[in-house]
Amino acid sequence: MFASQLFDLSGKIAVITGASSGLGQGAATVLAAHGAQVVAIARREEKLNSWSASAQGETSILAADLSDRSALADIAAEASRPFGTPNILINAAGINTRQPADDVTDAQWDLTQNLNVAAPFFLAKALVPGMRAKGWGRIINYASLQSRRAFANGISYGVSKGAVEQMTRAMAEAWSCDGIT
């Protein structure tokens, strides 16, 4: 049996944040190549355009700032327009600020928590009703080793990724009864 048969995502609609580079772009590339319709979200539109031009499969891009909590419901609605209601959400967007705890500013703390914790939660919350209506959904939140191991120069990032781990467990408790894991 070929990998394409084992990993066939035809008929699935995926929203992937942080898709302009790194792990998010890798996930978007693989899911599109295996048949999912992919909505790639990131801040850098030029990088999204470059990725989309080379991606195999059906893709759409959405340039958006996920750190703006007030825009997240609108971003989720916009992500649902190209292909319909998503049933896969991969939260790969994130920021890793590295500075000693004494040097962390309010703005740096807020940016890290908004992008790494609030964005995944509020995007999921906005997309879950559609997943629930379909009776199936998958939400993948990227965490980090720093969620379990403290680093002197990574307090805001480590705290955010610890929160992502716990949030993911709570999401599973809340939504698995609806087929959303």
Regions found by a protein language model. Give the residues of each.
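Conserved glycine-rich cofactor-binding loop
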Residues: 13, 20-22
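Conserved glycine-rich Rossmann-like NAD(P)H-binding loop of the short-chain dehydrogenase/reductase
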Residues: 34-50
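The beta1-alpha1 cofactor-binding region of Rossmann-like NAD(H)/NADP(H)-dependent oxidoreductases
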Residues: 63-74, 106
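Active-site helix of classical SDR
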Residues: 124, 160, 168
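Alpha-helical segment proximal to the catalytic Tyr-Lys
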Residues: 129, 173-174
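Residue(s) in the substrate-gating loop at a strand-loop-helix junction
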Residues: 144
